Amino acid sequence: MKVLVIIDVQNDFLINGSLEVPDGNDVIEPINEIIKNYALVVATKDWHPLDHVSFASNHQGKKIGDVVKVNNLDQILWPVHCVQESKGSDFPTTLNIKAINKIIYKGTNSQIDSYSGFNDNGKIRSTGLSDYLKTKNVTSIDYVG
């Protein structure tokens, strides 16, 4: 089975978001076009607690863009973004969320970041994505976002 994995298409990464990606909104329409070609669609969400280690505001004297060591890993400091249950963590209303079969939450541990949809940055804790894809007998993965 083939799966489409939508990576972190969330309000905080779009226009006027706290961690805006230039032209980030431009991915939404193409995703909505191709999503209908997949029987299985998974979306990842950055889903941070307010005390997350990646937020510059949680490191006294540090600013956005600084790099600090946390648990022997380099951590880039970001603005507060994709806080659990916030509008910034939501999918944009223009994304066809009805086609999403499963949401994988990442970055949920306040002490370690998770850039990957599969594991945290230290590869200590899985997000469950790999196990989920195995249960669905996935043989091919297409990524967008």
Language model features: what each stretch is:
Residues M1-L4:
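Extreme N-terminal starter segment of soluble prokaryotic enzymes
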Residues I7-F13:
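Short polar catalytic/cofactor-binding loops
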Residues I15-D23, G117-N121:
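Short glycine-enriched, charge-decorated loop/helix-capping segments at active-site entrances
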Residues E20-G24, N58-G61:
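Glycine-rich, phosphate-binding/catalytic loops in enzymes
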Residues E29-S140:
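Active-site alpha/beta core segments
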